[in-house]
Amino acid sequence: MASIRGRCGRFATVQQFINKRLVDAARKHRVVVRLKGGDPMLFGRAQEEIAALEAAAIPYEVVPGVTSALAAAAEAGASLTQRGVARTVVFATPRVGEGEAPSNWAGSAASADTAVIYMGAGQAREVAAALIAAGAARDTPVLVSENASLPQARRIALTLEELPQIACYGITGPTLIMVGRAFAAALAAAEQEALRKYAKG
């Protein structure tokens, strides 16, 4: 087994190297498993790996997983869609690969009832500013989920305006920024807990 995953805030292993490892391993072994966190078809660069395998005439099977957005929502008890509150969901990332043109991710995310931002924790200040500039309200509830579905999972509830504060939390694991009124209950619970701790002194 060989780990080829990236780390939060650090450069991931070069994708071409991963593609080569896959092809080389498939030529050497009868069965090779490329295990990914979440679902490979959502921000998993699966298409590049599939293309490499197809170019090498190597048969493959993609087994779907549970993307971290759904795992985080289930863990928090906060559905991404809610009757009368959230009917549209956008999955987006502010990160742009080398040589890629920037996308209007913020405009798409701000116009949705619920937005889930992948790979944005290291750019929290920029994410908040971009969403607010695109029309999102400053008091929009935000739920930040680190290491969703893992034993060391952690959630931080705050408003969009407060999002830059997550820089103080020492986040190191894979993190989602989930934005929208669907997370109002999580924000209210966090505020009540903060008041309770303040009252206890």
Predicted regions span which residues?
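A contiguous loop/helix-start segment that scaffolds small-molecule binding in enzyme catalytic cores
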Residues: 17, 27-33, 45, 51, ...
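Short, hinge-like loop/turn segments at secondary-structure boundaries
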Residues: 1, 20, 77-83, 134, ...
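Gly/Ser/Thr-rich loops at beta-strand to alpha-helix junctions
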Residues: 39-43, 68, 122-123
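Glycine-rich, charge-decorated loop segments at or immediately adjacent to ligand/cofactor-binding or catalytic sites
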Residues: 70-77, 153
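Structural signal for conserved beta-strand scaffold positions within catalytic alpha/beta enzyme cores
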Residues: 2-3, 62, 82, 90-93, ...
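Short, acidic/small-residue loops that bind anionic groups at enzyme active sites
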Residues: 51-72, 83-90
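Class I S-adenosyl-L-methionine
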Residues: 1-63, 162-164, 169
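Short, acidic/turn-prone active-site loops that include or flank metal/cofactor-
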Residues: 4-11, 66-68, 87-88, 94-96, ...
